[in-house]
Amino acid sequence: MAGPVSLRELLMGASAWLGSESPGGPSAEGGGNAAGTPEPPWREDEICVVGIFGKTALRLNSEKFSLVNTVCDRQVFPLFHHQDPGDPGTGIKTKAVSVGEAGGAGDPGAAAGDSLRGGMATAEGNRAEPGPQDFSLLQAYYNQESKVLYLILTSICDNSQLLRACRALQSGEAGGGLSLPHAETHEFWKHQEKLQCLSLLYLFSVCHILLLVHPTCSFDITYDRVFRALDGLRQKVLPLLKTAIKDCPVGKDWKLNCRPCPPRLLFLFQLNGALKVEPPRSQDTAHPDKPKKHSPKRRLQHALEDQIYRIFRKSRVLTNQSINCLFTVPANQAFVYIVPGSQEEDPIGMLLDQLRSHCTVKDPESLLVPAPLSGPRRYQAMRQHSRQQLSFHIDSSTSSSSGQLVDFTLREFLWQHVELVLSKKGFDDSVGRNPQPSHFELPTYQKWISAAAKLYEVAIDGKEEDLGSPTGELTSKILSSIKVLEGFLDIDTKFSENRCQKALPMAHSAYQSNLPHNYTMTVHKNQLAQALRVYSQHARGPAFHKYAMQLHEDCYKFWSNGHQLCEERSLTDQHCVHKFHSLPKSGEKPEADRNPPVLYHNSRARSTGACNCGRKQAPRDDPFDIKAANYDFYQLLEEKCCGKLDHINFPVFEPSTPDPAPAKNEPSPAPPDSDAEKLKEKEPQTQGESTSLSLALSLGQSTDSLGTYPADPQAGGDNPEVHGQGEGKSEKRPNLVDRQASTVEYLPGMLHSNCPKGLLPKFSSWSLVKLGPAKSYNFHTGLDQQGFVPGTNYLMPWDIVIRTRAEDEGDLDTNSWPAPNKAIPGKRSAVVMGRGRRRDDIARAFVGFEYEDSRGRRFMCSGPDKVMKVMGSGPKESALKALNSDMPLYILSSSQGRGLKPHYAQLMRLFVVVPDAPLQIILMPQVQPGPPPCPVFYPEKQEITLPPDGLWVLRFPYAYVTERGPCFPPKENVQLMSYKVLRGVLKAVTQ
C-alpha cells in the first residue's frame, strides 16, 4: 500500500473487486477483473492485523503515527500535519503517492491504491459523509514487507479530534446553532464516548494484536470501566454480529465468536523524560556503560504489568479462560513497553541536527563507509547508517555481554507477538488447572477484507434510517444496544444522580416546613424557592436540572393533592379559607363532601355595617362579589329599616329579551387621559363655586352675581353671561347616559369613567334615601343613630346665599362684581357686609361625611384627615373646607385595635340637609378608589337634584370593582389621599 488511507475508503474500494469477482476463482495476480479495477497483489497474503488506539498528549513525539513510522522504519505518516480546520481527520492521504523505496512495498501498492481510491469515488458519491457528531476516525496502512495491516483509531481522546469537538460545541454546531446547557453538553460527550466504544468494539473484533498508547507512564484506571463496558456491549451485540458475517469466507470459529482470535492487548507508555539514567560524572557520555540487569525502566515495566494484570483480574475483565475474555495478556511475555522521552524538545532543532549529522563525516563514520563510494551512493549509505539514530524517539537496542539483560526496541517488543500470529501458533493465554485452548485463524487479506467490511457496515457505517434493509435493521439494533454502556461509562451522571437523590428529600423537607394545611399559590412558590435553595446547596453534576424539575413536579403534586387553598380573594383582599372548591350553580346546594367540594367562598372575616339610611346596624360576611357587597346586604336591611322611606332610584338595566348578555370587557373608546381632563375641568369649576360661595357669604352678596354657576332656565335669570357660562360648563361635563341605554347588553360591573356609553348594570351600587324633612335634624344634638363615636354625630353647617332684593340694593351693580379678596369700589367692606340685609338672605344647609370601620364605629370628618370633635352644642366649623377639598375615601379609624396593623374607616355616607328655600342642591359624587390609572366611579345618574326640605343620605358603595378586578383597600405605607372622593360633590344653585 502506497500510504495510509481511511479504513472506510479501503473497505469500499476493496468491495469493488470483491463484488465483481467471478465464481470460478480469483483472477491472476495483478490482472484486471470484469469491472476493469486492478486487484492488489497481496490479496492472498496471510496478514496480521494490529490495531492502535489510546490517548495522545500535546507533545509532538507522543503521536501514535510516529510509532507506525518507527516500526515500519519509514515515514509512513508525515512528521508535521498541516490540517485544514474542516478536515475530519489527521494525516489522511486523499491521493495516492508512489513509494519507490527499498523494501518491496511501493510500486504495486501505489497502483493498487490508485485503483482503490478511483473505484470508490462513485460509491462515495451516493453516500453522505459521516455526521458532524461523530469524531472517531479509523485509518489503515498495510506493510507488504512484514505482512502487517495497521489500523489506527483517532477519536476524541486525541488532540486533533478533541479540538474539533470543542469548536463544534463553542460554535453551536452540536446544539443546532445554540449553546448547550450543562446537562446537554455532558450528554454530548457521553455520546462521543459511546461512538468511540463502537469503534473500539470493531477493533477488538477484527484485530489480532492491539496497542494501547498512553502519553504518561502511569496506567489510566478509566480503561477498566471502558473494557468492562466493551465486554458487556460485545455480549449484547454478539448475535447481531454473527448474523452480519454468516456468509463471509472465514472459518467456523471466527463466525461463532465474531473475531479471528481473542486479541492480545499490549500497552505503550510514554516516559516523557521523567525517568532518566544519568552516567557517572567520570564516565564519558559518548561511551556509556551497558545497562544494568534491572534497569529502572525495566523495573517500571514489570511494576506496570503486575498492576495492570491485578486490576483486570479484580474487575473480572481477565479470567482464566481467554476465549471468554474481551482480550488477553501474555503470561510469560512482556506486554508493557515504555517509550523513553525525547531529549530534543525542539523538533526543528532535532531535524537540523539530523541534517548536520548526515552532511558531516566523522572519523568513526568514515571507517564504516566503504572508500570506493562517493556522490549519491555515499550519501545513501550514510543515511542508511544514521537511520538507527532517527528512530522517532524510540531507543535502540544495546548490545549484551556477560549475560546482562537489555531493553527491547519497539519493533522487537511488537514483533515477538506478531511472529506468533504469522507462524500460526496463536496465543495460548489461558491459565488455571484446566485451560481451554482458544481459537485462532490467520486470514488472507481477501478474507479479512470480506469480514471486516461487513462488520464495518453494520457497526459503524450503517445507515440507521434505512430500516427496511437487513443492514439497516442490524445497525439500528446495535445502536439501541449501546444503552448498556451507560452503566459503565457515565460514572459522572451516576454519581450526580446519587447525589441529587440524596438532596431531594432534604428539599422536600424544606418545602413542607412551616406549611399550613391549605395554602395559596404564592406560598407554594415561596416554599418551592426555599426548597430549590436547599437542593442547590447539595445537588451537583449533570443530573441537577433533571431532579430540579422532579422537585418542581413533586411539590406541585403535594400542593394540588388536598393542600391547595382557594385562590379567590374577597373584595376586601382576604383569601377564601376553603381548600380548592367549586361554586354552587343556580339552585344547587353546597356539598362539602364532594371532590372538589361545592362551597361558597368564605374568608371567615365578619364586619358590622349600617343600612342605607344608617339607622340600623347588622353583621355582614366578607363579600366576594359586587352584588353581595353593594346590593344584597342592604336589600336585607331595607325590609327591616328603611324600606318605607322615600328613595331616589338610580337607572338600571331593563332587559327587552329573556336572556340578556353581559357586555364584553372591551377598553373604553375614550382617550387614555380622559379622566385627567375631566378632573381638570371639574376642579377649577368646583373650586370657583366654593370660593365664590365663601366670598359671597362674607361680602353679603347673592349668588346671582356669581358667574361660575349655570343658571336654572326655569328661574328666569336675567344675566346672559351667567347663562352662557353655565351652558359651556354643562357641555364639558361628561354624561355617560346621553343616549338611550341598551336593553340587550348589561354592564357586568360598576359604572366608571372607562365604561362604554349606553350600558347600565343590573343593580345600582349606590343608594339615596330621604330620612325626613329638614327640621328632623337637630343642630344641637346631631344625628340620633347607633354606632357613632360620641361627639362625632354632627353635620357641618353650610350657609348658602340666596337671591333676595333689598330695599336699598339699587345702588349696587350686580353685573360688575369685584374680583375675589377685593373690596367694592367706593365702599368699605365692613359697611357693605352689615347693611341692606334681611334674615332670609342666607339659607343654611347641613353636610356630613360619615366614615365607618369594620367594627361598626362611625364618625364624621370636618375636613381631610380631620375627625370631628364637638364639645359643646354643635360644630363651629363650616362645611366649605370639606366641600372644597378632595375628601379621603379611607382614613385611620378613630379607635385603633391592639394589633400593629392600622385600622381604616371608609367613607360610606354623605348626609345632606336641604333647607326649605328657593335653591337647588345638586349631588355629583365621584370616587377614585386608587392611584391612577384607577378610573373614577359615579352613580348611574351623574347629577341628582335633591328636593328641598329634606334630610338626604347618599350611601356610597362598599366595594369598587372594574372589569379588571376589584380595587382593594389600601395597605400599610400607602398614601391615603390616592383614594379619594373628588371635590365638587355638592353644588348649590339658587332659583
From Swiss-Prot:
InterPro entries: SMG8-like. The modification Phosphoserine is found at S115, S469, S668, S742, S895. GO terms for biological process: nuclear-transcribed mRNA catabolic process, nonsense-mediated decay; regulation of protein kinase activity. It comes from the Eukaryota. Residues 685-706 have a biased composition (Polar residues). Residues 290-299 have a biased composition (Basic residues). This is Nonsense-mediated mRNA decay factor SMG8. It comes from Mus musculus.
